[in-house]
Amino acid sequence: MEYVLDGKRFDNLEEFYAEVGRVLVSGKLWDENFDALNDLLRGGFGLIPDEFRLIWRHAERSRERLGYTETVRQLTSQLRDCHPTMLIKTAWALRAALRGQGPTVFDWLVVLISEHPNVELLLVEGD
């Protein structure tokens, strides 16, 4: 089974989650966050096959849109809401992102998806 995410359909992490919902779970309600995406990719919910190929079209556009500007936005939000034990780690990650260093939101997502042996991720530029 193949699913196709279209990088032209999202400009930020929240819109990425909406695209995942549209493509992988056909608009069914899901929590639309990093942990829920991890759970969804792990499978066992009956929403998607246990093994599948995920094609991410316009990946280079996504790399730009989910780059350091979006990473700073996400980490700033996390810093406001994070558990006190995560405060220093999040602050350091934000500091790095403000300098254009460290992993971006795009990197977070690629790593998360790639950690699932049941998912074959293909990053494709263009259609």
Model-inferred region functions:
Residues 1-127:
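Positively charged, polar, low-complexity stretches
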